[in-house]
């Protein structure tokens, strides 16, 4: 007789393999966390290297640098990138390359000079640091100011005829200087950047408008904004750089200022508009405090168009 176990085995079919359970769905990939942005910094006249992070605009940047070196933020006149020298082509504006080294130029000696305005133009190009100080970016060869040896590129203008201009924007200071009457002497109170020994005696000036040096290293930059958070962006395109340079040149010729960040903002605004009239309306809403004259806006629109054609 067959055993019960044998009969049971013969009468039982091999069970069909069951389908494997469905694999658990992959959770959506978490967005890649951006690494902390830490920048190296020194005082331009000499100091140990500090590290700063967590700023979104120029005022906050100055506060972080001041904290790193135990000084007041108001001691900082301006910053340059990757050079400790008073080099106006390396000024820190609205963008910092992620590998850039920041040098802070602090207040040095105060000096007063008397100037007589014998011509309509003094020969100064003014810019500002975005935190309340206007300073000299360029001195035109052969101009009134060029003949005054005590006045140097990088000097901050603190007062005109004892009237403090601390807190004024560059275009306001340039307008005050333009409106000073001819043939009457006036006094400028200037603060020069503190200098290391190897920087003493430099007096940089230029009558021309060289192309602003590219100070970013790498294709990403930290874009500082006067309102809102800073953002990491791709470095400007060839068109954006060329258009911004042309607009900055026009700012200098019309208003006596240079401001690459302002020029960049105007180029960005132009991308959202299809005509000079629409561009003018957008500028009024974004940059109304500048009160740009109509003929200036038309020239800016044309210059941006030329840059777009040149860069394809």
Curated annotation (Swiss-Prot):
<feature type="compositionally biased region" description="Basic and acidic residues">
    <location>
        <begin position="1"/>
        <end position="13"/>
    </location>
</feature>
<protein>
    <recommendedName>
        <fullName>PDZ domain-containing protein GIPC3</fullName>
    </recommendedName>
</protein>
<dbReference type="InterPro" id="IPR017379">
    <property type="entry name" value="GIPC1/2/3"/>
</dbReference>
<keyword id="KW-0225">Disease variant</keyword>
<dbReference type="InterPro" id="IPR056814">
    <property type="entry name" value="GIPC1-3_GH1"/>
</dbReference>
<dbReference type="Pfam" id="PF00595">
    <property type="entry name" value="PDZ"/>
</dbReference>
<comment type="similarity">
    <text>Belongs to the GIPC family.</text>
</comment>
<dbReference type="InterPro" id="IPR055349">
    <property type="entry name" value="GH2_GIPC"/>
</dbReference>
<feature type="domain" description="PDZ">
    <location>
        <begin position="112"/>
        <end position="192"/>
    </location>
</feature>
<keyword id="KW-0209">Deafness</keyword>
<dbReference type="InterPro" id="IPR001478">
    <property type="entry name" value="PDZ"/>
</dbReference>
<feature type="region of interest" description="Disordered">
    <location>
        <begin position="1"/>
        <end position="32"/>
    </location>
</feature>
<dbReference type="Pfam" id="PF25082">
    <property type="entry name" value="GIPC1_GH2"/>
</dbReference>
<dbReference type="InterPro" id="IPR036034">
    <property type="entry name" value="PDZ_sf"/>
</dbReference>
<comment type="function">
    <text>Required for postnatal maturation of the hair bundle and long-term survival of hair cells and spiral ganglion.</text>
</comment>
<feature type="compositionally biased region" description="Pro residues">
    <location>
        <begin position="18"/>
        <end position="30"/>
    </location>
</feature>
<dbReference type="Pfam" id="PF25083">
    <property type="entry name" value="GIPC1_GH1"/>
</dbReference>
<keyword id="KW-1010">Non-syndromic deafness</keyword>
